[in-house]
Amino acid sequence: MTAPDVSEAFKMLSAFLSQDEHYLASSQAYGDRGIQGLNDALYLFLEHPDLGFVWMAYDDDGVAGICVICYAVSTSMGALVAKLDDVSVKADRRGEGIGTVLIKALKEQLTKESVTRIDVAVHLQNPEARAFYERLGFQPLNEERLACVIKTKEN
């Protein structure tokens, strides 16, 4: 994502985050700050590309899919890893393989950047998402993700 892409990224991600029932069920635990939080996040990626990036898939009609990558260091691998977050394909384009192409291209790009693993969290009540990622080579882990908000811009 570059500066001119911010408005398209904002539209795509705000639609996803405001409608995804699985995200909404956990949004309070995430410390969701709504549209201001999303806007701040997009500009953080522009200002600090070392933290991660927003990956967008385009077709003739514009943005068809989007995802967010955040970098981390794995102490078990002793290497750079990536957290895949907020993956979405436009509602009227789902089922066309855009998500698969998006993730495969993302894996190629991250490999070039020496990223050794991609982690993704899937909501327990979303077996379709789990099956999607497993088809793309992701393996289930015997753990559950927890969140603890320690500070927001409001407090």
Q: Where do the model's predicted regions map?
A:
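A short helix-loop-beta-strand connector motif used in the catalytic cores of GNAT acetyltransferases and
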Residues: L42-M56, K83
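Conserved acetyl-CoA-binding loop of GNAT-fold acetyltransferases
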Residues: E134-E143
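Conserved beta-hairpin
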Residues: G52-C67, K90
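Conserved GNAT-fold acetyl-CoA-binding loop/helix
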Residues: A3, F10-Y43
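Conserved beta-strand-loop-alpha-helix junction that forms the acyl-donor binding cleft
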Residues: R94, V120-A129, A147, K151-T152
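Conserved GNAT acetyl-CoA-binding A-motif
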Residues: I103, L110-A121
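A conserved beta-strand-loop-helix scaffold within acyl/acetyltransferase catalytic domains
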Residues: I69-S76
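Conserved acetyl-CoA-binding loop-helix of GNAT-fold acetyltransferases
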Residues: V89, G95-E108, A131-R135
